[in-house]
Amino acid sequence: QMCIRDRSILYIYYGIKDGSIKDFTPTTFIFGAKSAPGYRRAKAIIKLIGEISKLVNADPDTKDLIKVVFVQNYNVSYAEKLVTAADVSEQISTAGTEASGTGNMKLMLNGAVTLGTYDGANVEIVQEAGEENNYIFGARVEELAEIMPKYDPREILFSNDKIKRVLDKLIDGSLSDGGVPSNEEGSFKELYKALTDGASWHVPDHYYVLGDLESYVQAKLKVNADYKDKLAFAKKCWLNIANAGKFSSDRTIKDYAENIWKIEPVKL
């Protein structure tokens, strides 16, 4: 779901530019990822993040408000620094597509609030630390089951001018892919068409990017506004740390031993 994140940054960038987003707290957006050599779409998304970085980091109107950083070859050594420093943990898989993960738990334990969908271990995080101490957005699994069979992303594209502006930047020459195969004429056309027309292996906007985008941006802006009250935000962080005990490996092993393996502890 990196593609919804890069589009949200463009949405905010152009909102700052046109004055519709005001009093924005300076924010650094950090991406860390890898792609298999032949995974063209992933390569194109990484290239797009680089182009967005060049755009917003150099613009005198936004360079003191937004920074975009892509960490190449993200690994444990980088994670040791970033996880401990992060204020916000973005866990933004489309609801129902993430089995679970541990990255969000590590960030929670280090005091980051979660900005994410109601998916994977995010569900347990908000159950433990409280939804009021985190930021949940987007359609839930049961809602998507009703939405997706009749979902037409073009309806959103042509009814929301701000989302259309963001998507148009992929094909109007504002951002160039620099020659990534299948994107045609130096644009990010394949990324655009994946959302509007689909591809050989999926329907249009298979991951409900456009459907969740407005909700995601509004959640992001709420985090941004809440961060101004440092004491209240710190309280959210501390409550996340204090309620991270469920994710202890000791608790997990004890539960497995009692409920799955049916074994008793042995004193050594």
Regions found by a protein language model. Name each.
Residues 8-11, 32, 40-47, 71, ...:
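A terminal-accessory region detector
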Residues 2-4:
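Short, small-residue-biased leader/transition segments that mark boundaries at the very start
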